[in-house]
């Protein structure tokens, strides 16, 4: 029993010495999750698939990048802003984007029909 306790104490001391953090690398201090805007910054897109294999010398990275439609880009912008996202659940992304990001100024109110002079 006494030798078992000595072995456990020695094992704990060795574990503490081996697990000492040297501060040479701060990888353990990095965030586990990255923001959505940076999610694809370190991942390269697939070079091809069974339906469109890469041709030539493989320098077609820019040709195979998908170009997002303006509607998809607006929807992603709206998803990042929570009030716009909640409004979009009820009214759709197009209306939500127009409401929150549509124009820099508020639309001018038209004068009444009686006030118009032709």
From Swiss-Prot:
**According to its UniProt record, how is this protein modified after translation?**
Requires vitamin K-dependent gamma-carboxylation for its function.
Q: Where is the signal peptide?
A: 1-19
Which SMART domains does the record associate with it?
GLA (SM00069)
PTM-bearing positions, type Phosphoserine: 22, 25-26, 28
Q: What is its main location?
A: secreted
Q: Name one GO biological process term.
A: negative regulation of bone mineralization
Q: Which UniProt keywords apply?
A: Chondrogenesis, Developmental protein, Differentiation, Disulfide bond, Gamma-carboxyglutamic acid, Osteogenesis, Phosphoprotein, Secreted, Signal
Q: In which tissues is it expressed?
A: Expressed in heart, calcified cartilage (branchial arches), vertebra, gills and kidney. Within the gills, MGP is found mainly in the proliferating chondrocytes and the pericellular cartilage matrix in the incipient calcified cartilage of branchial arches and filaments.
4-carboxyglutamate is carried by which residues?
21, 72, 76, 79
The domain of life for this entry's organism is Eukaryota
- Gla domain spans which residues? 56-102
List cystine links: 78-84
Q: Where in the cell is it found?
A: Secreted
Molecular function via GO = calcium ion binding
Q: Cellular component terms, GO, for this chain's entry?
A: collagen-containing extracellular matrix; extracellular region
The record's comment on protein family reads: Belongs to the osteocalcin/matrix Gla protein family.
- Function per UniProt: Associates with the organic matrix of calcified cartilage.
The entry's protein name is: Matrix Gla protein
Gene (name only): mgp
């Amino acid at each position: 029993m006494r030798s078992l306790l000595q072995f456990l104490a020695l094992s704990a001391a060795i574990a503490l010495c081996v697990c000492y953090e040297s501060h040479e690398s701060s990888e353990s201090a990095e965030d586990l999750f990255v923001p959505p805007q940076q999610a694809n910054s370190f991942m390269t897109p697939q070079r091809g698939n069974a339906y469109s294999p890469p041709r030539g010398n493989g320098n077609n990275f820019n040709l195979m990048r998908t170009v997002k439609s303006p509607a998809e880009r607006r929807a992603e912008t709206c998803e990042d802003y929570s009030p716009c996202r909640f409004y979009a659940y009820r009214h759709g992304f197009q209306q939500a984007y127009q409401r929150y990001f549509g124009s820099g100024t508020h639309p001018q109110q038209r004068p009444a029909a009686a006030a118009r002079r032709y």
